[in-house]
Amino acid sequence: METKKIINNSIAGFFSAITIGALTLLTYKTDYGLFLVASFGSTMVLLYGYPESPFAHTKNIFFGHLVTATVGVTALTFIPLPEYILIPIAVGLGVFFMIMLNITHPPAGGNPIIVIIGSASFDYLISPVITGSVIIIIFGVVLNKFILKKNYPK
């Protein structure tokens, strides 16, 4: 493997740890609430490993997470079905809306599962989904545009 690729991959891994570390610190060491969603870990792979992918675009990260989490909370709140029926319906609807709105972000496909299993309320959309996504996007722009000098965001 060439040296430049090893360096870039190391930087991507380092920034993934820094980004998730910042969200973890905000979650556990402040009184501001929750900033972490499990699917953010997968977002790191796309954002830092494959920033040229359309799935890693800023609008896809932000709106993909927001739409699928909204679908999950809405389904949980308004559809009185057992979780084993509700979860697949919500995931399917989340995928449908991401594709229809051209905001597909594969890691966000897991958000309805997280929301329903965790019995999240609409507050969950503000924090961690919106605040966490914005923080992730800021870190992604700093790394890709200013440090690695990539054409990001597109």
Each model region followed by its residue ranges:
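Alpha-helical transmembrane segments and their membrane-interface boundaries
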Residues: 1-74, 79-88, 119-154
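Alpha-helical structural signal
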Residues: 41-42, 94, 110
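Membrane-helix interface "capping/anchor" motifs
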Residues: 52-60, 98-108
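Buried hydrophobic packing segments
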Residues: 74-75, 97, 113-115
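Membrane-helix boundary connector in multi-pass membrane proteins
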Residues: 101-125
